[in-house]
């Protein structure tokens, strides 16, 4: 008997259990029969719905439906029927071929085609195949037809005309199109885009060739350690991530060996086909890298290979590759033996052996340069020079940075002669008159002794600031026995006093004016880290933001420091740079003013350092200031630099740049000093355009800052200076005695990189290539500049 009229809970439970799924094999027999009857009823309802919509019977359809629909989803069933129709190829009488009529692994004959369109606008074609007739094409094997080699439009659209010529020149050299050799020397001056040209060459050779396949499978770029990261950035920048490079920076020895072995052993396609490595790392692991063949090697800052006896040169010579490219932004400025080493590296035996070269060229050329040489010896020297130029001109290309005047803002260069302060003057004269200098001259027979070289360095430090020789004064070293009384009583060596140095006083005034005038940034360069310490003290005293790069900074940190300084939003006002550590390859376009605080014996080093700001990407007018102490040894160094650049060629230079080769007469001139003259350099020029140190005739309009100093503007006062900052500092500091200045071009002409494409089209049509700066023969006595007799 039921206790309540409510539904029975047992009925609810049975209903729930009946609706739950149970595998058919586990169901009882009578339950399976009931579900079968239920399905039959459902099928009958679905048939009625199909007849209603005019659909085919799903059970008799040629294509079964992927899912089963209930009576309530007839509309969905209609849509599914449309989607499930069999696809029919829209070609009459089409018979499908499932591969039964051909063998596996047989490749169809494919007609070779160039990777890029040679007829496209602004296309740079490096290889032009023969013009085949139609009859020849029909009889030739389509798989053996040569195709065009066309530079990727990604690069050809941004290459400037001189860069297009450079890429074509290097390609023809490494592919043996110019002769029986496969190497070349890219000797363009700084800022002309040697890196971009090499990136273009590497990318082209890795991707294509006349036979419609890559010419090389891997390449190695060897550079100074400070530039390895820069090369990686350049590849990423120009190729936009299309090529991954293997940059060897740091890491354990075991990991380095493993990575280099994997790179060397792999002969097929590599994920990172370009190895970026420093000279030092290559020398250490040369045994691994020289085991297997490499498609091409590029040596940046190649003047490091001027000595064929060093270990790095010999290690690179052991590399198994015939394609060698050497980059050097500075011309060869020393002896012919160094020049032979560079040419012999890229093209072995082009000039024969070292003994053959000396016998055939070097002896005759050097003999003709002697002051007591005969007319016949001079004539033979010129003939041998021209013969040598004819040989090496096939594999050397050099363009000057005058090309940049089309694309960059105007640049002003100024050589500023600064008077010594009273303290500097007394220290300088005391040292020159000391027994130390007399003994140095007496001990010097044919070449400078080590003592004389140390004395030269001491004089250079006095010209910069007395702080640099303070310890010598306190210790009463030779030459400074009587100099303690020269320093003032309130002298504190750890606190910078700009007023005790003429150059520091001028620098202090100019930095303050630049800081107050606007948002210009400044690069300060010196050959001595001690001078950088003084720069740092001055910056802290004036509360200038600064960064410093010298030899103690790691490679990874250098790139971060450069990026920070170049950031327009950065608070860094000064970039302090050691010319020995970072004078090559750095891009400091965040600044537009540069101070070269002390000169180097080698003009190439100064040129490299001063080219850091006037480069691609610079938007402001640039000002380059070279500071030298008037009448001192610094002016003598400047004169030797000027003499070297004006009378030397890229092949022949009998006047060597190193101070280790000064004779006694040279040292007597270096240790001379006249404190009354405004500029010893201007006096020795015997300038005919100036009367009593006042310029009466301007230089020719065709001259620029690459011309000889005698063809620059000469100023003995601040009138006519191109820089208002310097003009004001001249008045305020009262320590400037003379200024030489000139500009890079007559007027400011800036072209965007995009405009290079239009100019390139006209260049391609010209039959004459861009004029290259070719080495000149040795100058005879009567061919020298008349205004330069004193140097």
UniProtKB/Swiss-Prot annotation:
Principal cellular location given in the protein's record: nucleus
Q: Which residues bind ATP?
A: 188-195
Q: What segment(s) does the record annotate as region Required for chromatin remodeling, strand pairing activities and coupling of ATPase activity?
A: 2-9
Q: Where is the Helicase ATP-binding domain?
A: 175-349
Q: State the top-level EC class.
A: hydrolase
- Tell me which SUPFAM superfamilies the record gives: P-loop containing nucleoside triphosphate hydrolases
Pfam families from the UniProt entry: Helicase_C (PF00271), SNF2-rel_dom (PF00176)
Where is this protein found? Answer: Nucleus
The question of whether Transferase is a record keyword is answered with no
Annotated region (Disordered) at 1-53, 747-791
EC code(s) of this entry: 3.6.4.-
Q: Which GO terms describe its molecular function?
A: ATP binding; ATP hydrolysis activity; ATP-dependent chromatin remodeler activity; DNA binding; DNA translocase activity; helicase activity
What stretch of residues is annotated with the motif DEGH box?
300-303
- One GO biological process term: DNA synthesis involved in double-strand break repair via homologous recombination
Acidic residues composition bias: which ranges?
Answer: 782-791
Domain spans labelled Helicase C-terminal: 506-663
**Keywords on this record?**
ATP-binding, Cell cycle, Cell division, DNA damage, DNA repair, DNA-binding, Helicase, Hydrolase, Meiosis, Mitosis, Nucleotide-binding, Nucleus, Phosphoprotein
Record's compositionally biased regions (Basic and acidic residues)? 34-53
Spell out the Polar residues composition-biased ranges.
1-20
Sites of Phosphothreonine modification: 22
Q: What does this protein do?
A: Involved in mitotic DNA repair and meiotic recombination. Functions in the recombinational DNA repair pathway. Essential for interhomolog gene conversion (GC), but may have a less important role in intersister GC than spn-A/Rad51. In the presence of DNA, spn-A/Rad51 enhances the ATPase activity of okr/Rad54.
What does the record note on quaternary structure?
A: Interacts (via N-terminus) with spn-A/Rad51.
Q: Which family does the entry's similarity section mention?
A: Belongs to the SNF2/RAD54 helicase family.
Name of this protein: DNA repair and recombination protein RAD54-like
Protein's gene: okr
């Amino acid at each position: 008997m039921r206790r309540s009229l409510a539904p029975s809970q047992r009925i609810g439970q049975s209903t729930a259990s009946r609706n739950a799924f149970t595998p058919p094999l586990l169901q009882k027999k009578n339950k399976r029969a009931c579900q079968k009857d239920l399905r039959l009823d459902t099928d009958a309802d679905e048939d009625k719905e199909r007849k209603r919509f005019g659909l085919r019977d799903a059970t008799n359809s040629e294509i079964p439906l992927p899912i089963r629909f209930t009576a309530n989803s007839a509309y969905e069933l209609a849509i599914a029927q449309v989607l499930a129709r069999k696809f029919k190829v829209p070609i009459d009488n089409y018979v499908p071929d499932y591969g039964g009529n051909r063998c596996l692994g047989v490749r169809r004959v494919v007609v070779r085609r160039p990777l890029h369109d040679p007829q496209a606008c602004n296309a740079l074609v490096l290889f032009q195949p023969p013009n085949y007739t139609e009859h020849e094409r029909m009889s030739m094997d389509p798989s053996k037809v040569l195709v065009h080699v066309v530079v990727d439009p990604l690069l050809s659209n941004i290459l400037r005309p001189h860069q297009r010529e450079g890429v074509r020149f290097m390609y023809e050299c490494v592919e043996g199109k110019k002769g029986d050799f496969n190497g070349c020397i890219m000797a363009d001056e700084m800022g002309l885009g040697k890196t971009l040209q090499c990136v273009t060459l590497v990318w082209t050779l890795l991707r294509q060739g006349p036979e419609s396949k890559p010419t090389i499978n891997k390449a190695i770029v060897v550079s100074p350690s400070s530039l390895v990261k820069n090369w990686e950035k350049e590849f990423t920048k120009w190729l936009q991530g299309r090529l991954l490079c293997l940059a060897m920076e740091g890491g354990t020895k075991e990991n380095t060996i493993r990575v280099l072995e994997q790179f060397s052993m792999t002969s097929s396609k590599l994920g990172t086909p370009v190895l970026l490595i420093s000279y030092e790392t290559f020398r250490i692991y040369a045994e691994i890298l020289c085991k297997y063949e490499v498609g091409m090697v590029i040596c940046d800052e190649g003047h490091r290979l001027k000595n064929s006896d060093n270990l790095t040169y010999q290690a690179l010579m052991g590399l198994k590759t015939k394609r060698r490219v050497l980059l050097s932004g500075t011309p060869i400025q020393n002896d012919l033996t160094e020049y032979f080493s560079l040419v012999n590296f890229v093209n072995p035996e082009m000039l024969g052996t070292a003994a053959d070269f000396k016998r055939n060229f070097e002896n005759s050329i050097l003999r003709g340069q002697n002051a007591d040489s005969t007319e016949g010896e001079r004539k033979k020297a010129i003939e041998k020079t021209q013969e040598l130029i004819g040989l090496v001109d096939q594999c050397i290309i050099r363009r000057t940075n005058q090309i940049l005047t089309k694309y960059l803002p105007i640049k002003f260069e100024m050589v500023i002669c600064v008077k010594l302060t009273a303290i500097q003057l007394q220290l300088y004269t005391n040292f020159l008159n000391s027994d130390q200098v007399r003994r140095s001259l007496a001990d010097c027979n044919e070449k400078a002794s080590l003592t004389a070289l140390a004395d030269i360095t001491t004089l250079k430090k006095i010209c910069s600031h007395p702080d640099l020789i303070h310890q010598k004064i306190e210790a009463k070293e030779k030459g400074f026995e009587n100099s303690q009384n020269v320093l003032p009583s309130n002298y504190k060596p750890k606190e910078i006093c700009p007023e005790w140095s003429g150059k520091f006083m001028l620098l202090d005034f100019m930095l303050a004016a630049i800081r107050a005038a606007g948002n210009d940034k400044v690069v300060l360069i010196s050959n001595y880290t001690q001078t950088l310490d003084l720069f740092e003290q001055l910056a802290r005293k004036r509360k200038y933001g600064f960064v410093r790069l010298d030899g103690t900074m790691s490679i990874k940190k250098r790139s971060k420091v450069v990026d920070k300084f170049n950031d327009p939003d950065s608070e860094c006002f000064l970039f302090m740079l050691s010319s020995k550590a970072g004078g090559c390859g750095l891009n400091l376009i965040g600044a537009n003013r540069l101070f070269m605080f002390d000169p180097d014996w080698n003009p190439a080093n100064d040129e490299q350092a001063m080219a850091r700001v006037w480069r691609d990407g610079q938007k402001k007018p640039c000002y380059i200031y070279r500071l030298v102490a008037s009448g001192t040894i610094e002016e003598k160094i400047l004169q030797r630099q000027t003499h070297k650049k004006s009378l030397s060629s890229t092949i022949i230079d009998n006047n060597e740049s190193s101070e280790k080769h000064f004779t006694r007469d040279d040292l007597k001139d270096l240790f001379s000093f006249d404190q009354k003259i405004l500029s010893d350099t201007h006096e020795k020029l015997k300038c005919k355009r100036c009367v009593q140190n006042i310029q009466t005739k301007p230089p020719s309009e065709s001259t620029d800052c690459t011309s000889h100093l005698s063809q620059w503007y000469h100023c003995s006062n601040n009138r006519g200076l191109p820089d208002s900052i310097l003009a004001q500092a001249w008045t305020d500091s009262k320590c400037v005695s003379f200024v030489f200045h000139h500009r890079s071009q007559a007027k400011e002409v800036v072209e965007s990189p995009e405009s290079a494409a239009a100019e390139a089209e006209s260049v391609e049509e010209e039959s004459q290539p861009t004029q290259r700066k070719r080495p000149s023969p040795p100058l005879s006595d009567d061919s020298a500049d008349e205004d330069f007799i004193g140097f």
